Every structure is written in structure tokens, then in C-alpha cells.
Amino acid sequence: MNKQSRLEELLLSWSERPSEDFSRSWQMRKSPSCGIIRSGPTTGKWCIFAPSSDVDQAWAKIKCAVEGDNLLFAKVSTALRSMGRDGHVICVYTQDWTDKQDLLHVREVLRSLGFVDELGYKRDIDTLKRIYGPDEWYLRA
């Protein structure tokens, strides 16, 4: 097999494991009770950063919590999206960043899954407006 064929095969390879999935940029899961969720002025996400060596195990925990209706919606960057980067990001969404009780509840669910290190929460409105760094609203917990 020539190099071009192997590269095409690799780039089109699908895997349930984010660290090996080159078929798409993100894998996503929605809870059974989740309706339509769209990024907008009130949505936001907890961001979990993981190296390629740990992302599959971390994503398995998040998927299980989403499918069990303990979390609303989540996505993970795949090998395709993470090429040239230090690792992966898992985003765990909430509907309304102004609902502090829900933000902290979701954070506690993540803590119960073993994500005990400090995490950051980012509003989608800042991402959509390309506001980064000191000008973005960012919660750490």
C-alpha cells in the first residue's frame, strides 16, 4: 500500500475511541431527556482537558453519565481534531450559565466521576463572539 492510500485510510477510519477516530472532529452524546440543544447566549460548558493516553477512559465515564441522564450533553475532540495539539478536550454542556445551582450540580456530577482537579466553565456566547483570555467570562471550580 502506498503512503497516499494509507493516509486516506487513516483519515477515514472511524473508532468509538476518540484517540483513534479520524473520521470526524467531534464525538457527541445527548441524554435521553435532552431536547434540542444549540449554542447560544445562555449555553456553556465545563471543559476537561485530557492527554491522548487518558481521553478514551475519561470519555467512557462522561458517555455513561450522559446516557444515564445525569448529564445533558457532551462532546469530545477526536484524533482528527487533536492533530498537532497537546491533547483532547471534553465539553460537558449546560443550558443556562446564569443558573449557578445547575452549574455546580453538573460540577459535582463530574467530581463524582473522578474529575476532581479544577475545571473551567466557559460561556458559548464568548466562544461565538471569539472572546478569549482576560475578556472572557470564565468560572473555575
Language model feature labels by segment:
Residues 1-141:
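Structured alpha/beta or helical-core interaction and ligand-binding surfaces enriched in interleaved
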